[in-house]
């Protein structure tokens, strides 16, 4: 690669936003009220049975009573809405407090009371225990929490909004022999019933044409020279969430159908895997051997309550990788670990962060991924003004990943800038598959609410069945994010934001008037409220807006500019 000299003409600096859209201050997130203490109940005295034999009495007295778990229990909900008074009736006290603080006006409540109940149900069902395994507990030693790691790690000199899995030395999986994509290093075993996958979708589409050579790095600069210190993160409410499926919950009365005071019977939840079952399953996935003999750790780039992230070198190839070491005992959703590893291992693509290997070392799981130094798209979005050509290029790369996943009946369900990772060569890759869903022929739709609220499609927020097009909606919101620096409703109360998504559908935003007609049509095609009218990923790849895409190498200068802006803001 030719280095810049003093005689070379450097391109103009990328436009920087006058003020960063990243949140610089810690924001207080309201805590849910604690449940009331159960009232003490007096034990009922039983009359002795005079017909019982004494020896039988002694035997029964020595035995401890066996109490079975409750079955066929009922939870009664009586929530109604009185249009005359404009008030909800029978609403739990905790819900009433949330509604009072939500800034949802009385007029809005009257216009769509069902949307209010849906929003309340979603907000109260969100559980921190359902966060993805890539996200650690929010534990920071310094006063200013890290802005970039969405998994809550305390960053070291380098940080990203998600696990920084990238690398430029990994062979393009579309050029690999389909029968060798799942190698022994990835822990593949023919007895597992998960055969190697082929790549039949868009094999001739290149994510970076040969003419798009990576830009030269200025003389004397390396990616390590431009790594900034960490700055505060986005609000905690932008973290991904998980709520249990509808079939596991108590029903909410559908006010649109005149259902007031519905009695809901609790149904059996899906059986949760035990720790022993998780370990047994992981042993069929991971590689056997000592990872220290294959990889040499270089730098620790993050740490948290249950693990650490390192950059490392594969000894045999000298390729740079990322290794995440996790203590399985500290992972709240161990099943998601298995889900993510299996999905990434069996769905390799040039626009998806590659899973390379995994090992079980005592109680620790080591996951090896490819590593890219560019960080997440969030840094570029919040610090730089992106041209239409750059936005089109990013959207094209993400759509290629989505088209590939959807063709294999996989829904990502958490598309946002935090989960788009960049290489210094301009490569764009999708990561974080902790919430992805595999659809079977028998189950073409999902009802589980997952993802991040501000990027959620209306059918997800309203808890309807949904399919792959929820990813397309999230891509449309991400396109707005690249224009505005943040998604719509980010400054609204979270409960009100959920209500607005369910009620308004396609959001309005200030920068819309300055967009070109082609860009507007592209966003509108992705943000169709009616799912049948919303374009698919394959259809959007044919949209004329993508023809204005600039070379991916142009992203290099935006990445550098964003890092410098973050460093200056941190030092000021």
From Swiss-Prot:
Active site: 414
InterPro entries listed in its UniProt record: CRIB_dom, CRIB_dom_sf, Kinase-like_dom_sf, PAK3-like, PAK_BD, Prot_kinase_dom, Protein_kinase_ATP_BS, Ser/Thr_kinase_AS
UniProt cross-references to Pfam families, sorted A to Z: PBD, Pkinase
Membrane topology qualifier: Peripheral membrane protein
Family according to the record: Belongs to the protein kinase superfamily. STE Ser/Thr protein kinase family. STE20 subfamily.
Role this protein plays: Required for hypodermal cell fusion, together with cdc-42 and ced-10, leading to embryonic body elongation, which involves dramatic cytoskeletal reorganization. Plays a redundant role with max-2 in dorsal axonal guidance in ventral cord commissural motoneurons and in P neuroblast migration. Acts probably downstream of Rho GTPases mig-2 and ced-10 to regulate these 2 processes. Involved in orientating axonal growth of HSN neurons.
Name this polypeptide is given: Serine/threonine-protein kinase pak-1
Organism: Caenorhabditis elegans
């Amino acid at each position: 690669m030719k280095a810049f000299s003093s005689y070379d003409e450097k391109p103009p600096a990328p436009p920087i936003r006058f003020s960063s859209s990243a949140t610089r201050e810690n924001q207080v997130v309201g805590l849910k009220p604690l449940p009331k203490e159960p009232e003490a109940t007096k034990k009922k005295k039983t009359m002795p049975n005079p017909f019982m034999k004494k020896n039988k009495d002694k035997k029964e007295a020595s035995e401890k009573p066996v109490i079975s778990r409750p079955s066929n229990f009922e939870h009664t909900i009586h929530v109604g809405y009185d249009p005359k008074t404009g008030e909800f009736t029978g609403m739990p006290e905790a819900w009433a407090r949330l509604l009072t603080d939500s800034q949802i006006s009385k007029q809005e409540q009257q216009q769509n009371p069902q949307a209010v109940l849906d929003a309340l149900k979603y907000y109260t069902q969100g559980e921190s225990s359902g966060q993805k395994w890539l996200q650690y507990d929010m534990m920071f030693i310094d006063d200013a929490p890290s802005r970039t790691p969405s998994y809550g790690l305390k960053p070291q000199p380098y940080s990203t909004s998600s696990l920084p899995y990238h690398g430029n030395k990994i062979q393009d999986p579309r050029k690999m022999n389909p029968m060798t994509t799942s190698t022994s290093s990835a822990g593949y075993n023919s007895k597992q019933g998960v055969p190697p996958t082929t790549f039949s979708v868009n094999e001739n589409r290149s994510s970076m044409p040969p003419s798009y050579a990576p830009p030269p790095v200025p003389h004397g600069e390396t990616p390590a020279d431009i790594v900034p210190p960490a700055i505060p993160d986005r609000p905690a409410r932008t973290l991904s969430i998980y709520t249990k499926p509808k079939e596991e919950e108590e029903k909410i009365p559908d006010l649109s159908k005149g259902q007031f005071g519905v009695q809901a019977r609790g149904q059996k939840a899906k059986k949760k895997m035990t720790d022993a079952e998780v370990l047994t399953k992981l042993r069929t996935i991971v590689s056997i051997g000592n990872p220290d003999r294959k990889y040499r750790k270089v730098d620790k780039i993050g740490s948290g309550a249950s693990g650490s992230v390192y950059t490392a070198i594969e000894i045999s190839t000298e390729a740079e990788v990322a290794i995440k070491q996790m203590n399985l005992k500290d992972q709240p959703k161990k099943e998601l670990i298995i889900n993510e590893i299996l999905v990434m291992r069996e769905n390799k693509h040039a626009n998806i962060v590659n899973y390379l290997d995994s090992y079980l070392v005592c109680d620790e799981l080591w996951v090896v991924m490819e590593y890219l130094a560019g960080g997440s798209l969030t840094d570029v979005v919040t610090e730089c003004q992106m041209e239409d050509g750059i936005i089109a290029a990013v959207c094209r790369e993400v759509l290629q990943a989505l088209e590939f996943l959807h063709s294999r009946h996989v829904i990502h369900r958490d598309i946002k800038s935090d989960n788009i990772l960049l290489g210094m060569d301009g490569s764009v890759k999708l990561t974080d598959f902790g919430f992805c869903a595999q659809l079977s022929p028998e189950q073409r739709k999902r009802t589980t609410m997952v993802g991040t609220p501000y990027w959620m499609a209306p059918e997800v927020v309203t808890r309807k069945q949904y399919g792959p097009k929820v990813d397309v909606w999230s891509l449309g919101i991400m396109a707005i994010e690249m224009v505005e620096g943040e998604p719509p409703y980010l400054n609204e109360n979270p409960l009100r934001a959920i209500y607005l998504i369910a009620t308004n559908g396609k959001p309005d935003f200030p920068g819309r008037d300055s967009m070109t007609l082609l860009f507007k049509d592209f966003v509108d095609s992705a943000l169709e409220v009616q799912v049948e009218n919303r374009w698919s990923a394959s259809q959007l790849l044919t949209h004329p807006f993508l023809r204005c895409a600039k070379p991916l190498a142009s992203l290099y200068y935006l990445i550098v500019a964003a890092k410098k802006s973050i460093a200056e803001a941190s030092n000021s």
